[in-house]
Amino acid sequence: MLKKTAPNSPKRRRCSSFAAVDLVGSANRTFMVSVSLPKELILEILKRLPAKSVKRFHCVSKQWASMLSCPHFRELFLTRSSSAQPRLLFAIEKHNQWSLFSLPQRLTPYEKSSSSSVVVTPEFHMKFPPDGMLIYPRHDRRFSFGYASGLMYFYGMWINEHDYDGVPVICNPLTGRYASLPFLERYRKAFSFFGFDPIEKQYKVLFMAYPSGPDHHTVLTFGTGEMSWRKIECSVKHDIVSDGICINGVMYYLGDTSEFMTAFVVVCFDVRSETFSFIYPGSYCEVINYKGKLGLVFCDDYTDDAIELRLWVLEDKEKIEWSKYAYKLKDEKFSAHYVSIVGVSAAGEIVLSMADFTSKQPFYVFYYNPERNTLQCTEIQGFEEHHGTFDRRSRVRVFVDDCSSFYRFADHVEYLNVDEPKLLKSKIYDGPNAKIEWEEEEEEDEDEDQEKEEEDQWS
């Protein structure tokens, strides 16, 4: 119920049509002033708002929730919203808890190289998991954290004290909602990746037991119905070497078909068809998203202050045709900090990041523009404010109990998942974005019927 106001004060009531309605009261009578707005104009306004504001508007009425949840508005928002600026996403793990930060990418490349650093402070989003939950497993945490189209995937969490092996968890870092997936036997070791099919609008989890084999691969579709794991076949036996990325509905990760890390293979898993294909790069490489295409990065030399690398970009998936480039990046900070390739920004710059971090030294992100041959360094400050100090050096892609770990994603967008209330029902924390409660006033039956008719128009 909405709070009642004094008789002589202006009141606003919910309307069954898309209109602004004011009830202006006086001592003797009340006047209703209604200004109707075209639905197209309302959508034009709403799609320009930040995702947090649109989330709040879900609680205006059921009619508004229906409008904001329709596929048409979802597409409009994702393609034109001012909040859809690509960002760098930082996830820091310490003492069984993640802290999630993000930082806007540069939309225009740097004009020239600079030895001085730009100092920025990332936006803090949330901590995960909440009290009472723990990260699983405690020791081997390789490839236990994934990201796809706005949602995060955690390989395993102990939800309560009765859990023995933990269950996979999917979380939205923007709103703090999460959902646990069905339990799955994990054998001695197991790895999993998270992907999104943009055609069917479906999230899927690919799970692999170690040692991998034809019958050790399963997949799950994340949705509102009954979820279950399904066995799928993989023709090439391989071990997992790298983290995975999802590009246009295909998961990519590096594997090894030998026992001595000498026969590398890029495993390609089509999220929609649930089939595997394989690319053989010839040597170790990192997989990145290069402007919506698969990119392989080979680091040929790493001197005191320079990095020599080759970049292969997959231009034709059927014929396996590549565009190949070679670069030499030089910065005095390379001598003191090992860096790794993160990906490619929306401005076409190759993004590199420090591979380790402690509170006693700065943390840097580097932007290299291959067309202009410019390198710009950005110093990130403010992690300690929300997650305390880090005395130990943390390593990338290695989850160790007594040190922190970083994962960086170069294509993070604050994605408005309008189906989230159906998919992610639990709330991690009581922040301003998590408290979305319905406040409705009682209506006559004829108002509800009219509202239902207008809801159907947006379904």
From Swiss-Prot:
- Protein name, per record: F-box protein At1g47340
Gene3D superfamilies, sorted: 1.20.1280.50
Identify the stretch annotated as signal peptide in this record: none
Name the source's superkingdom. Eukaryota
Where is composition skewed (Acidic residues) in this entry?
438-459
Segments of this protein annotated with the region Disordered:
434-459
SMART domains (alphabetical): FBOX
Residue ranges constituting the F-box domain according to the UniProt record: 31-76
- The organism encoding this protein is Arabidopsis thaliana
